[in-house]
Amino acid sequence: MFGGKGGMGNLMKQAQQMQDRMQKMQEEIGNMEITGESGAGLVKVTITGSHSVRRVEIDPSLMEEDEKEMLEDLIAAAFNDASRRIEETQKERMAGVTGGMQMPPGFKMPF
């Protein structure tokens, strides 16, 4: 049924290897930093692979200098709030799909 002697053991070994590779990949992605730009580089947001904002940069030509730091902090906070809300929405929708069955910790939707 599973390819002869040892077939089931090999299948389980392959599944474990795949799980290990996926976990390593998720850790690598989580440690990445990616910068997005808008306005031809006038606004830059750097986030981690886990969607946490690391840095927000706004060209001073877009505002008064004394408000720059506060605006940067507000943009970062708004982005983090939106990211948190997306995670909550995904969990709620997933609960509807799975009939309320709890998913393992760290389980992410494929999209």
From Swiss-Prot:
The keyword Isomerase does not apply. Signal peptide: none annotated. It is found in: Cytoplasm, Nucleoid. Residues 1-23 are annotated as: Disordered. GO terms for molecular function: DNA binding. Pfam families: YbaB_DNA_bd. Keywords: Cytoplasm, DNA-binding. InterPro entries: YbaB-like_sf (IPR036894), YbaB/EbfC (IPR004401). This is Nucleoid-associated protein VSAL_I1086. It comes from Aliivibrio salmonicida (strain LFI1238).
